[in-house]
Amino acid sequence: MTHEEILAMLGDYVDYLIANSSAEAPMWNIEKVRSGKPNKWNYIDGCMITACLSLYKTTGDEKYLRFSKNFIDWFVQEDGSIKTYDPKEYNLDNVNQGKNLFTLYDIFGDEKYRKAIETIRSQLATQPRTKEGNFWHKDIYPWQVWLDGTYMAQPFYMEYETRFNKMQGCIDSYKQFMNIKKHMRDEKTGLYYHGYDESRQMYWADPVTGCSPN
């Protein structure tokens, strides 16, 4: 199979996904669809809409932009509230989808996206933290730092701080990354452990390092 044939096949697959997906029933999260449970604002959709917006930027094909906008608009209300999203859950996973709001705001200039950005930023303003200052991964996971939580929250955090807050939170973000390096990096391999429990109370936490087994 040639490079061109592979690209064509991938393009057909993506087109099939978006043609058969909606915010209420995204085909890429088929387990959720089959469960019969209503879809919620979540990080999986965030990853896929980021991919669709990247395809729009790369190809210029409006179908990717239309799909992304329609998907996000199902959740984002005119007042900036986000259907099914509660900032007080303090779940870093839910921040990930917020990255797409910056792109849609840049393209369309609709203030509801700007307001929704503030809605998500309000979560980080009061997100519980470890004693050293890192965001808890979730309120239901106290004192825990997870690598994927860093991916979920920090890009949005830095985008916001750079655009709208005169970079005031950049040092805070840097310190959080340095704490991760300090506690979660294996000096022998250079690889990182997935989780860290500052309290050492979780069953998986090493009693000395606080890190997960892997």
Predicted region positions:
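Extracytoplasmic mature domains of secreted/periplasmic and thylakoid-lumen proteins
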Residues: G80, P87, L92-M152
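Well-ordered alpha-helical scaffold segments within catalytic/enzyme domains
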Residues: M1-T2, G46-D61, N96-D110, Q154-K166
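Solvent-exposed loop and edge beta-strand segments that line ligand/cofactor-binding
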Residues: T2-I6, L17-C47, V76-N96, H137-T150, ...
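Broad hydrophobic/π-residue packing in well-ordered secondary structure
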Residues: Y43, C47, Y64, N96, ...
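Alpha-helical scaffold segments in carbohydrate-active enzymes
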Residues: D12, Y16, S54, W74-Q77, ...
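Low-complexity, Ser/Thr/Pro/Gly-enriched N-terminal "stalk/linker" regions
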Residues: M1-V76, E111-T119, Q123, Q127, ...
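Extended ligand-binding clefts on enzyme/binding-domain cores
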Residues: L147-N214
